UniProtKB/Swiss-Prot annotation:
Pfam families linked: Anticodon_3, tRNA-synt_1g, tRNA_bind
Any one Gene Ontology cellular component term annotated for this protein: cytosol
Lineage: Archaea, Methanobacteriati, Methanobacteriota, Methanomada group, Methanopyri
Listed name of the protein: Methionine--tRNA ligase
Cofactor: Zn(2+)
Family: Belongs to the class-I aminoacyl-tRNA synthetase family. MetG type 1 subfamily.
Stated role: Is required not only for elongation of protein synthesis but also for the initiation of all mRNA translation through initiator tRNA(fMet) aminoacylation.
Ranges spanned by the short sequence motif 'KMSKS' region, renumbered to the chain: 332-336
């Protein structure tokens, strides 16, 4: 394998990091890069902060500060938050024009290449202008009523209620957020990136790139099918990267034009520091570029950014890993309401590895997940403390107490050798395919096996009855402990290091090869063992819950007779295709269905018999609610719900007279 360039979405410097940011983007990228490096692969992790655009300019204006002050403050806070969680970067920089002139140069280099190639076009546009403030009103400088859903408070670039991207002139009843007055429409010249010219190339790339996850591919292809529109890449603003074109001296690039170029800027800065050529990463077929992002910016990374790369002849992403949303105690996180867990607050109460563990195992990355303090306590205490920590501590404590603190010289049961090899192979395969939860679960299964092996062979009896066999059992357990330390290193770096040092090793587990997990443990003296993980107590939980307001405020002011658009948008309604159907044993009406919903196949139990025979359901496309609480019925776990009409159910059908609809497409 050649070089691997791992990037994480640039953190926007208008606030510190919360656990949702960590789960979707930074943690999986860190795990993946650590894994690659342990395998001896030439991999680097590039990241930083995104510092331009209207939100920062507006925040600075409202606070009476310079944008640079906002950027500098939150850049340092974000960097510290990432360090608190042991998330390591080979290069961590910023896009701020005042602090990083290299990024200005790189952004303008991209623009000039695209301009010279004919992909940039000048057009006259309408924009809102505030006569009171005597200024244009780009993006969030204006609010109003969404023209699509009627929600009040829609911003000039986006409606939070229905998720639509907007232009300021589309808003109904617009008002300037600075002075509150009604703006007027004026005309000005802007520059457009001709995204439409890349429509066919993007479609081919999306459909042929098997490395792209389904949640990314399906979402991006849906945009392509609806027709790509050319992209306005400048703003009438004084905060951003200047446009190097005559007549545009008072304008800057749109933040989503310059932000992804930050990946290239930071790579060049890394290469300049270590004496490499940045084009070996961005203009080489031997490099795999892996982007880790949140699902809210799929369109930017799967359409806009690849088109820009095509336009300059650069390497396209190998894959784009998009983490889904994280809720908090069943409610959408909200920084404005304080319904959020900040990284800094968490790490004051608990070790970083506890958060890393929970965010990985709570749900696959490609599914929405919920952070619950009660579930966090249960998983830490039952899985880390009672399973993994217990096995390591009881093994090493027994060796320390009864074998003079020396790992015994003995043979290892073949059963253990085989189990370690099998686990190592599965963990490797899962990580190669970005299945982080499944990989870490396999490691925990190995420690569970170790506990069962220890309990079954009763070394506390063998030490007196059969010392030779006792030595074999304990050496086998110590070998499992070593394998656990190595395979945990990408996931739980601090805990893996503790386990490694507990075996008497003086080097770092982060400096050993991934294959070291398969090697025998060394015969050496160990230090007195200490517990690896702290137990989460009720007192700890009370302190943690005190960080949140008593109520999330999610339903404040809502009429119980109505469902808000925000509530409706929490429903994950998709097109599903039934792959298998069979009667549920013991039930008169239930049919068990296996349904393809794009990024995964789910099981649903539905009362469709005798209206429908199982055979006639296979191949049908149906409407699926994909994020309903799972429920067990007649011994079958139902993970989704299909929608139908009436007590004698009539399935809703999908109109495909205009185009074919794919499993996984969202219903909105």
């Amino acid at each position: 394998m050649g070089k691997v360039l791992v990037t994480t979405a640039l953190a926007y410097t208008n606030g510190p990091l919360h656990i949702g940011h960590v789960r979707s983007t930074y943690l999986p990228a860190d795990v993946y890069t650590r894994f690659l490096k342990m395998r001896g692969i030439d991999a680097i992790h590039i990241g930083g902060t995104d510092n331009h655009g209207v939100p920062i300019a507006l925040q600075a204006e409202l606070e009476g500060k310079d944008p640079e002050e906002i950027v500098e403050k939150y850049h340092e806070m974000i960097k510290e938050d990432l360090e608190r969680l042991n998330i390591h970067f080979d290069e961590f920089s910023c896009t701020c024009r005042e602090f990083n002139p290299d990024h200005v140069d790189m952004t303008q280099w991209f623009f000039k290449r695209l301009y010279e190639a004919g992909y940039i076009e000048e057009r006259e546009v309408e924009q809102l202008y505030c006569p009171e403030c005597e200024r244009p009103l780009p993006d969030r400088y204006v609010e109003g009523v969404c023209p699509y859903c009627g929600a009040e408070g829609a911003r000039g670039d986006h409606c939070e209620a229905c998720g639509r991207y907007l232009e300021p002139v589309q808003l109904e009843e617009p008002r300037c957020v600075i002075c509150g007055s009604k703006p007027e429409v004026r005309r000005t010249m802007h520059l457009f990136f001709k995204l439409s010219e890349f429509e066919e190339d993007l479609k081919k790339w999306l459909e042929s790139n098997d490395n792209l996850p389904k949640n990314v591919r399906n979402y991006a292809i849906q945009w392509v099918r609806e027709g790509l529109k050319d992209w306005d890449i400048v703003r009438d603003l004084d905060w951003g990267v200047p446009v190097p074109l005559e007549g545009y001296e008072d304008k800057v690039f749109y933040v989503w034009f310059d932000a992804p170029i930050g990946y290239v800027t930071f790579t060049k800065q890394y290469c300049d520091r270590v004496g490499q050529d940045w084009k070996d990463y961005w203009f080489s077929e031997d490099t795999k570029i892996v982007h880790f992002i949140g699902k809210d910016i799929i369109v930017h990374h799967a359409l806009f950014w690849p088109a820009m790369l095509m336009g300059v002849g650069a390497t396209l992403p190998y894959t784009i890993v998009a983490g889904e949303y994280l809720t908090l105690e069943g409610e959408k996180m909200s920084t404005s309401r304080g319904w959020v867990v900040w990284v800094k607050d968490f790490t004051k109460l608990f070790p970083a590895d506890l958060l890393r563990y929970y965010l990985i195992v709570v749900s696959p990355l490609t599914r929405d997940a919920d952070f619950s303090w009660g579930d966090f306590r249960d998983r830490v205490n039952n899985e880390l403390v009672a399973n993994l920590g217990n096995f390591v501590y009881r093994t090493l404590s027994f060796i320390y107490r009864f074998l003079d603190g020396n790992v015994p010289e003995a043979e290892t049961d073949q059963e253990i050798v085989d189990k370690i090899k099998e686990t190592h192979q599965r963990v490797t395969e899962h990580l190669e395919k970005f299945r982080f939860r499944e990989a870490l679960t396999e490691v925990l299964r190995l420690s569970k096996f170790g506990n069962e092996y220890f309990q079954e062979h009763e070394p506390w009896k063998l030490k007196d009855e059969d010392p030779e066999r006792c030595a074999e059992v304990l050496r086998g357990c110590a070998r499992i402990v070593k394998a656990l330390a190595v395979m945990l290193a990408p996931f739980l770096p601090d805990s893996a290091e503790k386990i490694w040092q507990s075996l008497g090793y003086e080097d770092s587990v982060h400096d050993v090869d991934w294959e070291e997990a398969l090697e025998d443990v060394e015969t050496k003296e160990i230090p007195e063992p200490e517990p690896i993980f702290p137990k989460v107590t009720e007192e700890d939980l009370e302190k943690a819950k005190a960080l949140l307001p008593e109520e999330s405020g999610e339903s404040e002011g809502q009429d119980d007779e109505y469902v808000s658009l925000e509530e409706f948008n929490r429903l994950d309604l998709r097109v599903g295709k039934i792959k298998e159907a069979e009667r549920v044993e013991g039930s008169d009406r239930l049919i068990k269905l296996r349904i393809d919903i794009g990024d995964r196949t789910v099981t649903a139990v539905a009362g469709l018999y005798p209206t429908y025979e199982p055979e006639e359901l296979v191949g049908r496309k149906v409407v699926v609610l994909a994020n309903i609480q799972p429920k067990e019925m007649f011994g079958v776990r139902s993970e989704a719900m299909i929608l139908a009409v009436g007590d004698e159910p009539a399935l809703l059908t999908i109109d495909e007279s205009k185009r074919e609809v794919e499993p996984g497409e969202r219903i909105r």
